[in-house]
Amino acid sequence: MASFSAETNSTDLLSQPWNEPPVILSMVILSLTFLLGLPGNGLVLWVAGLKMQRTVNTVWFLHLTLADLLCCLSLPFSLAHLALQGQWPYGRFLCELIPSIIVLNMFASVFLLTAISLDRCLVVFKPIWCQNHRNVGTACSICGCIWVVAFVMCIPVFVYREIFTADNHNRCGYKFGLSSSLDYPDFYGDPLENRSLENIVQLPGEMNDRLDPSSFQTNDHPWTVPTVFQPQTFQRPSADSLHRDSARLTSQNLYSNVFKPADVVSPKIPSGFPIKDQETSPLDNSDAFLSTHLKLFPSASSNSFYESELPQDFQDYYNLGQFEDDNQVPTPLVAITITRLVVGFLLPSVIMIACYSFIVFRMQRGRFAKSQSKTFRVAVVVVAVFLVCWTPYHIFGVLSLLIDPESPLGKTLMSWDHVSIALASANSCFNPFLYALLGKDFRKKARQSIQGILEAAFSEELTRSTHCNSNNVFSERNSTTV
């Protein structure tokens, strides 16, 4: 595809006026998320971290709150990036850091929620084991490992994110070798509206690189190319000159290249093409001649460009017409998207759904039916909200790999993609309110202190209840045996 987003793995935000409905909706969501999530998560972090007794449950939710708080701190940059239609005034470091924070929040949150689900499942099915092995130190070690893995999953953002310049504005986007994906790609304008091929792909060398016609005299495979200035004959370029000029190609945005007819190509002569002073008649059909002899266009049929003598990166440029004709998605981007989908969503979702299904089934069988653990309800609802917020993000990411961005469906998909990003970011502001609102009597909770609310939400009630029930069953079995 031709675009991928600044914050995400999937699609770049299209260049739309700030007053378009998708942009307005995204800005509203991001603004509310920041205004509510920053104080909410900060309050939970302060109370649960400094005022409450440290338990296994508080460790889980403290780290979850920390991940949400980091995401909220990055939202002003994302909001400004959206309002500026993709302009990036923050420099390269923040170009790598801000998108990675959102990805870090995704992986850290989903891994922590998976750990909480497994912990709840162990509490129900292995109460005796939990009494002996479930402790704060183990929970802290697991959280440390989760942060390390989440950071590793962000490495592609640091590797592939770069700053590009277009229309005197800095852009933050992915770059996969010669393939580049910038934020707000439509901001650059339609390449077909440009009147020169150099606006899309710069040929090696400039007009001031022309050599003195008398400096080279050779009859080795002359290529006659007329220009509007004077008739000239090009000689086969040397590998050294092509290697020097090809270095310039790596900085070009070669991902979505639209070749213009040769009659509108500005007559620039690549350096390293010696010129022999020879009178030649201009060709009437210059576009056909250029495509046949210089292989500038994908329709050319001649294979006499001496590929064996060209450096590899110049051969990549030479084969430009073949590697993006069908909007082929770069392989690294496919790998990043699929990895995030599987590791950051599908696999954890299956584990969490299975864990809570087993817990509900076990609780309905008898002795667990009366257990009303606030922590269990909090965990279930937090997982459900996470899935609701992040599902559109991953759906848009996969569809962006499959749908042509130039099709009507593709354009609609791209225009609403940043709404899915904003919705995913909004997940970071919900949890503090879920901790406070989940309970039988909200009015009673409203009269409690913040510390009392969090202590009730993060209580170890299920552990104690399960342990007591397990001891009762054990005692009943002993009395029956006697």
UniProtKB/Swiss-Prot annotation:
Receptor for the chemotactic and inflammatory peptide anaphylatoxin C3a. This receptor stimulates chemotaxis, granule enzyme release and superoxide anion production. Glycans are attached at N9, N194. The chain crosses the membrane at residues 24-46, 58-80, 97-118, 140-160, 341-360, 378-400, 418-438. Keywords: Cell membrane, Chemotaxis, Disulfide bond, G-protein coupled receptor, Glycoprotein, Membrane, Phosphoprotein, Receptor, Sulfation, Transducer, Transmembrane, Transmembrane helix. It is a multi-pass membrane protein. GO terms for cellular component: plasma membrane. Among the sulfation sites Tyr-174 is essential for binding of C3a anaphylatoxin. Pfam families: 7tm_1. Disulfide bonds join C95-C172. The modification Phosphoserine is found at S459. Residues 47-57, 119-139, 361-377, 439-482 are cytoplasmic. This is C3a anaphylatoxin chemotactic receptor. The modification Phosphothreonine is found at T463. Residues 1-23, 81-96, 161-340, 401-417 are extracellular. Its main location: membrane. Belongs to the G-protein coupled receptor 1 family. The modification Sulfotyrosine is found at Y174, Y184, Y318. Interacts with VGF-derived peptide TLQP-21. PROSITE patterns: G_PROTEIN_RECEP_F1_1, G_PROTEIN_RECEP_F1_2. GO terms for biological process: chemotaxis; inflammatory response; phospholipase C-activating G protein-coupled receptor signaling pathway; positive regulation of cytosolic calcium ion concentration. It is found in: Cell membrane. It comes from Pongo abelii (Sumatran orangutan). It comes from the Eukaryota. One of its GO terms (molecular function) is G protein-coupled receptor activity.
